[in-house]
Amino acid sequence: LNVSNCPYLKDYSVLKEFSNLKSLNISYNEPEHFTFLKELNHLESLSMEQTGFKDMSLLNNLGDLKELNVSKNRLKNLEKFVNVEHLESVDAKFCQLTEINFLKNARQLKHLNLFTNRIKDIRILKDAKDMVYLNVGRNDIKDITCLKEMKQLEIISLENNNVKDLTPLKELTNLCDVDLYNNVIEDLTPLEHLEFISYLRLDHNAITDLTPLSKLKYLRSLTLKANYITDVTPLKDLELLEALRLDDNPIQDTSVLESMEFYEKFTN
């Protein structure tokens, strides 16, 4: 049932009669209250983006819940939301979260979006080994050790954090889309064997040596703006590269790239 973007709909109490409802989207509405959720204990998918929802304890009757979107809300009582065992997808971006301990037992998570919060510690995710998509961009994360067991991970965004050590990524060979924009990264060596990466964003770091990227033969898009790169020779054999940004680097010579098929598209 999709009743999103219906701002004049305030009373949802009638939904209590639909106890077998499997999917509900009330995003971008402003319900007077959310107590009706307690009766919808067969819900598998629930979207409440920007609704004013706060009290996560109201979801504890939803034992079948697999997909949850509570983005753009100021959540509270996170510690009282314990029915998370079946969750596969959680969107909680722009929620001003400072911790995510409520996800401790969410071991079936495949999709997690925590973009733009205030999170420093993501160690609680160490058992989410089936994760395919993870966005923790725009937080305050330094330690990504917990990611090393996420062998299924394909897409990750760590942009705008304080990550320096990429070692936990070195065996995540399914990665194809990696966003590391605006961190404090110096060493790219952990990426050198992640051969299926096709999109890589590394702008605004402290990178000097591109040698580890020379083996990423499937790279199609690479952005390296605002680093400390002087030598781009390691990129010369990346034959599939279609987009390359090298602005704001002290590069001495780009002539080695002139033989590349898409050279005319590149900006340096």
What do these predicted ranges mean?
Residues 1-10, 14, 20-32, 42-54, ...:
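Concave beta-strand-loop units of leucine-rich repeat
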Residues 37:
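Acidic, Mg2+-coordinating catalytic modules of nucleic-acid enzymes
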Residues 257:
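Conserved catalytic-core motifs of eukaryotic protein kinase domains, centered on the activation segment
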